[in-house]
């Protein structure tokens, strides 16, 4: 899949499925590391340990930030950076990052808290934004029968 006039997507973004019920955060982190480095730097459970992930609470944002800072990356997160105030600003943020080849690791309320990576945005070629979708690399892809690691979600619902 390649970007076009209404689709912005990171090409060749490899997905992986998490190995435990609580390591979606480390799996998402490893997908991003692999995108940039061509391979993971640490095994998923080692990443979970560095992040302070637990079997009951998974991984919090601070743990995610700590891991990327530990490996020497510049991190932007909701802990210290301004987040988009409106849906329109959110879409601009997503599209801008993707056009700069930057995947966006996000946590949301699915499964009581779940980490995924935004790797694509599609305006569907329409003038209104209510039908726009996000393409996610999902380490727990059970929402369809493909289990290919990709999911498509309504952008407005996600925001």
Regions found by a protein language model. Give the residues of each.
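Active-site nucleophile-adjacent alpha helix/oxyanion-hole segment immediately C-terminal to the catalytic cysteine
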Residues: 1-54
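Conserved active-site-adjacent core of cysteine acyl-enzyme catalytic domains
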Residues: 3-9, 45-159
């Amino acid at each position: 899949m390649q970007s076009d006039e209404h689709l912005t997507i990171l090409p060749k973004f490899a997905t992986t499925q998490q190995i435990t019920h609580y390591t979606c955060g480390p799996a998402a982190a490893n997908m991003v590391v692999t995108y940039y480095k061509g391979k993971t730097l640490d095994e998923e459970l080692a990443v979970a340990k560095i992040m302070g992930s637990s079997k009951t609470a998974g991984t919090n944002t601070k743990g995610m930030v700590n891991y990327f800072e530990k490996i020497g990356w510049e991190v932007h997160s909701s802990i210290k950076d301004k987040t988009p105030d409106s849906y329109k600003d959110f879409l601009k943020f997503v599209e801008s990052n993707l056009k700069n080849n930057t995947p966006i690791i996000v946590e949301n309320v699915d499964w009581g808290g779940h980490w995924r990576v935004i790797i694509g945005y599609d305006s569907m070629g329409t003038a209104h934004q209510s039908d726009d979708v996000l393409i996610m690399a999902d380490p727990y892809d059970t929402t369809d029968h493909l289990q290919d690691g990709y999911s498509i979600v309504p952008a407005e619902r996600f925001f």
